[in-house]
Amino acid sequence: MVWREQLENFSPEEHWTQQEEQQSFTLPVLMFHYIQDIPATTKDQRGYRLSYAPQKLDKLLDFFEEHAITPLTFRDLKAIVEGRQTLPKRAVILSFDDGHLDHYTNAFPVLRKHHAKAVFFVIAGKPDQDPKFATRDQIRELASAGFEIGSHSVSHSNLASLGSKRLREEVFESKARIEKEIGLPVLSFCYPAGRYDARVLKLVKEGYLFARTTQP
């Protein structure tokens, strides 16, 4: 996992070297939250730490193009494992957490400009309920444009702290809602705040092929 502050000096050669030496998928996953240009002097220091400017994303994708780095999705990894697709020599996954409105307004145009693939992990209970998040129509547009939409639960709760019934709703209801909206299977899940326990792992394995966390 590569965090915002690490992107300034991003050099994932170690991942690719390991990938070439082993018969396994070892590739960097770049995690983004807000795609917005926010000054370092802002009072919202958490927002600043979790933000990445659109122009920096543009330059990062320029760098990828110059160095033949290919953004993939988890859907691509499934195709690679099944032998329907070839793994590029240099590959990364771009993942965007939460389904913020700026993913649609700021990240989407930059990704489309570079023909770059990405995965958007959506909090299923937010579209059309919170103006800070992308709408259902916008999520559908992202899916129609070829981006992968994954689940980030229904409410972004700490799943490890929930009772069994609520936990199942967060894991499976989020998948069902998103699939109903986009008309495609949801293959990937992102643990809210990276938190999970054995119960969470078991349920996610039942409903998804891939899961992403910030915790090893």
Model-derived features with residue positions:
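N-terminal structural segment of carbohydrate-active enzymes
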Residues: 2-12, 20-71
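Intrinsically disordered, low-complexity boundary segments flanking structured domains
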Residues: 13-19, 138, 176, 212-216
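A generic local structural motif
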Residues: 16, 78-82, 134-137
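Short boundary motifs at domain starts and secondary-structure transition points
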Residues: 17-22, 82-87
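Metal-dependent polysaccharide deacetylase catalytic core of the NodB/CE4 family, i.e.
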Residues: 25-37, 47, 88-92, 100-200, ...
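C-terminal domain-boundary segment and adjacent tail
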Residues: 49-86, 179-181, 196, 205, ...
